[in-house]
Amino acid sequence: MSLTIPANLVLNPRSNKSLTQSVPKSSARFVCSDDKSSSSTPQSMKAFSAAVALSSILLSAPMPAVADISGLTPCKDSKQFAKREKQQIKKLESSLKLYAPESAPALALNAQIEKTKRRFDNYGKYGLLCGSDGLPHLIVNGDQRHWGEFITPGILFLYIAGWIGWVGRSYLIAISGEKKPAMKEIIIDVPLASRIIFRGFIWPVAAYREFLNGDLIAKDV
């Protein structure tokens, strides 16, 4: 019994040679691509660090006052605003001439003049925007550059209004157990009211505590 090997199954030496030569080329190519990916990692980290540093600088930099709303200009650049300042100061100085230099009215007018100058200076310093009439305008569109014009005073107003209401409520509750509570509403009990006034400064905490306890709202009126 004999075996016959077909001629097409015999490997060509040239093909073996080319096969052995192609292996290192492909492996060399693989090594180069691996080096490139590993070297790109530090570069990406450097780019990310630079982006973070740049964003922190931009966020920490103060924003200048610009005319970002149609028809309004920064008060420090408004001619009508400067004209109003001169007119008010001139009016006060003309009234000052009617009194002796060291008299009480003269001292009051001098203080008023300094107060007027300081007020106009603060309007220009804090970036308020003025209209064509030279008057500052409050911006209430939520822009962070104008929070100090509306949101901060608004929160302060709500706190003061809540403090007044809380103190009055606490006083009425305190005198409700008296024999003649109506008389204490007409003639205020000053010592009791003084104690309640100072306790009223923490009214947000006290209101939250009563809300949790169920005492904030009367159950039966």
Swiss-Prot record:
SUPFAM superfamilies: Subunit III of photosystem I reaction centre, PsaF. One of its GO terms (cellular component) is chloroplast thylakoid membrane. It is a single-pass membrane protein. Keywords: Chloroplast, Membrane, Photosynthesis, Photosystem I, Plastid, Thylakoid, Transit peptide, Transmembrane, Transmembrane helix. The keyword Membrane applies. GO terms for molecular function: mRNA binding; protein domain specific binding. Residues 1-32, 33-67 form a transit peptide. It is found in: Plastid, Chloroplast thylakoid membrane. The chain crosses the membrane at residues 147-167. One of its GO terms (biological process) is photosynthesis. InterPro entries: PSI_PsaF, PSI_PsaF_sf. Plants lacking PSAF have altered thylakoid structure and are not viable. Belongs to the PsaF family. Participates in efficiency of electron transfer from plastocyanin to P700 (or cytochrome c553 in algae and cyanobacteria). This plastocyanin-docking protein contributes to the specific association of plastocyanin to PSI. This is Photosystem I reaction center subunit III, chloroplastic. The lineage of its organism: Eukaryota, Viridiplantae, Streptophyta, Embryophyta, Tracheophyta.
